[in-house]
């Protein structure tokens, strides 16, 4: 169970009521708060962090269901206040806990690439991973394509840029790469391959808007 959650119990006439009890920690290892609101939760079964609040709701409700069943197995009646049930008020209690009672406690996620053959740790702060391993191999298709589209010198620049992303050096390099040329010269082809290489780790922006002084 995550370190910021306990299951509260109240004995009432004829039944037991259970509810999620959110616990303040000096520094939670399973929950991140950023800007006074939920940022991420650690999902042990996936070995990843998640910024999807519905994953948190599911995890809490799963724990409530487990405790509820334990009580029923002892022959007792139980009323469970689930997070998914808006009328229970538990989701409101959760938002109050995050926004009013917790201090910011977070580490930026996905600051480095994670490959499918990499053993993940919580302190890798990853919410995603690439669907292929990082390992040595031959690239005949890439070699053939690049030999047609680019000179050896230009190909070297592109592969150097890709390599800097893989090693993480690109975060400190004050450089960027621009592909230019007439239609059909392979710009989109190379960009599409790079996007596939770093699926989930790239974003798209409007270069014209970026250079507009009014923005």
What are these regions (language model features)?
Residues 1-125, 129:
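Intein modules and their embedded homing endonuclease domains
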Residues 28-54, 58, 106-215:
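P-loop NTPase catalytic core of nucleic-acid-dependent motor ATPases
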């Amino acid at each position: 169970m995550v370190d910021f959650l306990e299951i509260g119990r109240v004995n009432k006439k004829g039944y037991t009521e259970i509810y999620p009890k959110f616990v303040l920690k000096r520094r939670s290892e399973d929950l991140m708060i950023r800007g006074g609101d939920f940022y991420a939760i650690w999902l042990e079964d996936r070995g990843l962090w998640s910024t999807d609040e519905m994953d948190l709701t599911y995890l809490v409700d799963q724990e409530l269901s487990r405790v509820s069943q334990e009580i029923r197995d002892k022959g007792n009646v139980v009323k469970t206040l689930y997070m998914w049930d808006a009328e229970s008020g538990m989701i409101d209690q959760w938002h109050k806990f995050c926004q009013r009672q917790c201090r910011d406690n977070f580490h930026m996620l996905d600051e480095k690439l994670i490959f499918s053959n990499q053993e993940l740790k919580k302190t890798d702060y990853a919410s995603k991973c690439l669907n292929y391993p990082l390992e040595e191999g031959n690239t005949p298709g890439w070699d053939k394509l690049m030999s047609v589209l680019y000179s050896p010198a230009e190909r070297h620049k592109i592969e150097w840029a890709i390599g800097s992303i893989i090693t993480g050096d690109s975060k400190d390099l004050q450089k960027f790469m621009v592909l230019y040329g007439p239609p059909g010269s392979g710009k989109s082809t190379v960009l599409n391959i790079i996007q596939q290489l770093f699926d989930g780790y790239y974003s798209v922006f409007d270069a014209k808007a970026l250079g507009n002084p009014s923005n």
